[in-house]
């Protein structure tokens, strides 16, 4: 941990508890700040409040009182999920109070080697693969943190100058991280996500580009080269560009040619040996390979990781095989692109479980993939009618169900030996579940109840 004094004696407001907010509040106390912690909700667990107050932190819950804007805070550390049009946040913006996220705080105290990953899809898998690959050859600590469910600042506290930290960073986190400066930045892809938060696609892209904003030619931007738009986005970086390409559009970084993965012209391994399924995971592997090779990792270490790593929970996760049916949990697929890619990973007939929060879009784009890959669909949630329309256009039998739990026995009734039963909703979970993780866990529980087996 790097010693800094910029918070000594400063008044700091932490907005939003959560894992990152609580850790940030305690860290700020260590850094000498006078900390107030505020959450709009009232925590069900009183231990959270007790722990904060025991550290000398003033706690305000149940509201984001606008009066806090008049208390002379020097800095606001905001939960990434709180939008900037929140009245209290907007008041701080208007008066020019610096607003950062916990990721910025983590960067400020970190003095090791930083690798950061962002993108619309594939962030967590790429982050995990990169950390595992670098750790295989490392003589010092290699950890991961960030949007992967582990506080950036908490891990940064425990690492030294020779250690490496691989961070997954969302657009929400990056928007409040103005000085972050990874030596290696990775952009897996950029689609049109979270426009309810960012308002426009350009705002979303600009938030993502904060990952490379402070890089120089001595740093590296690893970026997907398979779309012209992404190549143009790369030109906005001052870093040395290192492309990765599944579609063989560049030989300057990592790429695939005739089923073989190459790094700058040298063979690494065949794509068929990657344990993770699907073209999206080839792309994730290519991104991780590029970062690993830039970090001095050997091909043997890369092969070891890619031939053994079976995936991240809720991300095209293999659950089990039962009576010759394969069950997969892809609850993290909360947009059309993710489900489109997931379907392309299977060469067996798919019984698709899809639906969720209605964000106002329709699903015509999925029709060709339904025609090619989907045998039947079970639809649920707010957008089930729109999902049903797309299934009907594809000529696929569609059954309506209440949710991802009740859909499991319905899918079983329609399945035959050799089929895949896949939860890949193409929508957020918030109409029925508090998170995609809970939705995925409940799906797995339903599969376990149906089969009488535990997930593998």
Curated annotation (Swiss-Prot):
Localization in the cell: Cytoplasm
InterPro entries given in the database record: AlaDH/PNT_NAD(H)-bd, Mur-like_cat_sf, Mur_ligase_C, Mur_ligase_C_dom_sf, Mur_ligase_cen, MurD
Keywords (A to Z) from UniProt: ATP-binding, Cell cycle, Cell division, Cell shape, Cell wall biogenesis/degradation, Cytoplasm, Ligase, Nucleotide-binding, Peptidoglycan synthesis
GO biological process, one term: regulation of cell shape
Primary enzyme class: ligase
Keyword Glycoprotein included in the entry's annotation: no
The UniProt record lists the keyword ATP-binding: yes
Pathway membership: Cell wall biogenesis; peptidoglycan biosynthesis
Chemical reaction(s) catalysed: UDP-N-acetyl-alpha-D-muramoyl-L-alanine + D-glutamate + ATP = UDP-N-acetyl-alpha-D-muramoyl-L-alanyl-D-glutamate + ADP + phosphate + H(+)
EC code: 6.3.2.9
Source taxon at top rank: Bacteria
Binding sites annotated in the UniProt record for ATP: 119-125
GO MF annotation terms: ATP binding; UDP-N-acetylmuramoylalanine-D-glutamate ligase activity
Gene Ontology CC terms: cytoplasm
Function according to Swiss-Prot or TrEMBL: Cell wall formation. Catalyzes the addition of glutamate to the nucleotide precursor UDP-N-acetylmuramoyl-L-alanine (UMA).
Alphabetical list of HAMAP family matching this protein: MurD
Family statement: Belongs to the MurCDEF family.
Alphabetical list of NCBIfam families matching this protein: murD
Name of the protein described by the UniProt record: UDP-N-acetylmuramoylalanine--D-glutamate ligase
